[in-house]
Design a protein with these regions (language model features):
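Hydrophobic structural segments
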Residues: 4, 10-13, 17-191
């Protein structure tokens, strides 16, 4: 959150870091930009990466982000005015058997596709390609104040810079071991 003093100072200069940025980008342009940073070639062969549902030529209005594509996440994206729902996990791995809204509490992949089309929200994901991304591998350790070591629990075959499960070092605490309670508190603060 911006504090009031900095917002007022920017307003006096005629600037505002809170002003909405405008840009022209299509859904296909967004996908292309993300695939440049998170290459589809890094994804597991069984995974789906990139645009799953949507029209590449349509403009991006806003982008909503969620872990999973669910009918509720699609509805929230649409309500927020987003034309894209960017998720970690794909809406489906195998093609759905049917595309229809679900009346039950169980959410089927077909119901997600139905909701996306009905609400005109494109679905895009980068699952395992993001899991092994060098840039993404540094985000959580950075948030938790851990040192990234460029070592992985499961390195990606043929790569020294990519893999699953980054191994991190806990920073030195004036010669004292890191207390589990302090590390847990950092996790709670971040998440």
């Amino acid at each position: 959150k911006a504090d009031k003093a900095s917002t007022e100072a920017l307003s006096k200069r005629g600037e505002s870091h809170l002003a909405p940025r405008t840009f022209n980008m299509t859904i296909g342009g967004l996908e292309k930009a993300l695939l440049k940073e998170i290459p589809a070639e890094d994804a597991e062969k069984w995974d789906r990466t990139g645009l799953l549902v949507g029209e590449r030529s349509l403009p991006v209005t806003r982008v909503a982000v969620a872990l999973d594509a669910t009918p509720g996440a699609v509805a929230a994206a649409a309500e927020a005015g987003a034309s894209v729902l960017l998720t970690h996990h794909p809406a489906f791995l195998e093609a759905p058997d049917a595309f229809a809204p679900e009346a039950s509490a169980l959410e089927s992949p077909g119901a997600v596709v139905w909701a996306a089309i009905r609400n005109q929200v494109a679905l895009m994901d980068f699952h395992t390609a993001l899991d092994v991304s060098p840039a993404a591998a540094r985000v959580l350790p950075g948030m938790l104040g851990l040192k990234f070591t460029l070592r992985f629990a499961e390195p990606l075959e043929g790569s020294r810079r990519k893999g699953y499960g980054q191994i991190c070092e806990v920073p030195d605490n004036d010669g004292e071991p890191e207390a589990l309670a302090r590390l847990a508190a950092r996790c709670m603060a971040v998440f």
